[in-house]
UniProtKB/Swiss-Prot annotation:
Entry comment describing in which tissues the protein is expressed: Expressed in skin, eye, whole lung, trachea, esophagus and stomach. Widely expressed in various tissues including spleen and thymus but not pancreas. Expressed in macrophages, dendritic cells, T and B cells. Expressed in lung specifically in ciliated bronchial epithelial cells (at protein level). Expression is decreased in lungs of asthmatic model mice. Expressed in the cornea.
UniProt keyword Cell division, yes or no: no
GO CC field: extracellular space
Keyword terms: Cytokine, Disulfide bond, Secreted, Signal
GN (gene name): Slurp1
The protein's name: Secreted Ly-6/uPAR-related protein 1
Length: 110
């Protein structure tokens, strides 16, 4: 086999593989209890992150309800400063397959 044919076969193999496979994120469009938001969606090729937005947190004792979140695939996720004061709806971004199952700083079951 000549070098030319080898190059064509290599080019054809690379082309047939496509650009890669999109990753998956947990999704819930409406505010949902953090432990209940478990729908899995295949993200679009242009999506680069999984996004979680903290919508509500119980502010009164006895704190026995789970925080409400929305989750989605995102093509432009801008995380908020986790130490920021007064952020109404903190945003968490992550960049792996199914990485948005939790929320930083929240411990389930407490």
């Amino acid at each position: 086999m000549t070098l030319r044919w080898a190059m064509w076969l290599l080019l054809l193999a690379a082309w047939s593989m496509g650009y890669g496979e999109a990753f998956r994120c947990y999704t819930c469009e409406q505010p949902t209890a953090i432990n209940s938001c478990k729908n899995i969606a295949q993200c679009k090729m242009e999506d680069t992150a999984c996004k979680t937005v903290l919508e509500t947190v119980e502010a009164a004792f006895p704190f026995n309800h789970s925080p409400m979140v929305t989750r989605s695939c995102s093509s432009s996720c801008l995380a908020t400063d986790p130490d920021g004061i007064g952020v109404a709806h903190p945003v968490f971004c992550c960049f792996r397959d199914l990485c948005n199952s939790g929320f930083p700083g929240f411990v389930a079951g407490l």
